[in-house]
A protein has these predicted regions:
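Walker A (P-loop) phosphate-binding motif
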Residues: 1-29
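Short coil/turn segments at beta-strand junctions that form active-site/ligand-binding loops
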Residues: 5-7, 34-37, 98-100, 129, ...
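General beta-strand structural signal in soluble alpha/beta enzymes
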Residues: 11, 38-42, 74-77, 102-106, ...
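Gly/Ser/Thr-rich loops at beta-strand to alpha-helix junctions
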Residues: 13-19, 45-46, 108-110
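A short acidic (Asp/Glu
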Residues: 20-21, 50-51, 115
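N-terminal phosphate/diphosphate-binding loop that engages ATP/GTP or pyrophosphate donors
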Residues: 25-82
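Loop/turn-to-beta-strand initiation segments
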Residues: 69-73, 97-102, 130
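Conserved catalytic-core segment of NTP-binding enzymes
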Residues: 82-88, 93-97, 107-189
Length: 189
């Protein structure tokens, strides 16, 4: 990590994205070589946190204060109890110019461990440097219809039905598909 490091990580895929983001944030805050300034937000929706580093309004002044105080910011506008939506794109762009690792939840899965995206998904920020695709491995061995979000898309990509059992190779197929795990991902990401 360097002072001039500017990186955006967009997290997409099935259920577990927020858990992965929380773990990454914790690693940044507990790094033995010194904390890595980190901000968390979304281009879609994400769970709210009650931590003191939560930012509920798009203010660069407050963003910088929280980052200075905690070296972490979890941000978004509350749309219902416990759920956040993204701030305006312009605010996220301004945040991305700060010396901070920006972790963005960029997809929704309604808590299903596996998914294939709809036409409008995922919502990956164009300045993203890394796309992290999450799949819940607890889905393996279960019927596709019971563990997959956007089942029609999953069936089409896998050439299977909802009654079929999800296998490890199915997750690999989804992860590598330009219609699923690699959708909207450029070679630079």
């Amino acid at each position: 990590y360097k002072e001039d490091f500017h990186k955006i990580v967009s997290v997409v895929g099935g259920g577990g994205k927020t858990t992965v983001i929380r773990a990454m944030l914790r690693e940044c805050m507990e790094n033995s070589d010194g904390r890595i300034p980190c901000a968390v937000s979304t281009t879609t929706h994400i769970q709210k946190t009650n931590a003191e580093y939560f930012l509920g309004e798009p203010s660069m002044k407050m963003f910088r204060k929280k980052l200075s105080d905690y070296e972490a910011v979890w941000m978004g506008r509350e749309i219902r109890k416990g759920k956040l939506a993204s701030f305006q794109k312009e605010f996220l762009e301004e945040v991305s110019r700060e010396p901070v690792l920006l972790l963005l939840e960029a997809d929704g899965a309604k808590h299903f461990p596996v998914k294939a995206p709809a036409e409008h998904e995922p919502v990956i920020c164009e300045k993203t440097g890394i796309v992290l695709n999450v799949y819940g491995m607890r889905a393996i061995g279960k019927k596709i219809k019971d563990v997959c979000f956007r089942i029609g898309e999953v069936e089409k990509i896998l050439g299977k039905t909802g009654e079929d059992i999800l296998r490890p190779e199915d997750i690999m197929t989804l992860a590598l598909s330009r219609s699923a795990g690699r959708k909207c991902v450029t070679d630079e990401m």
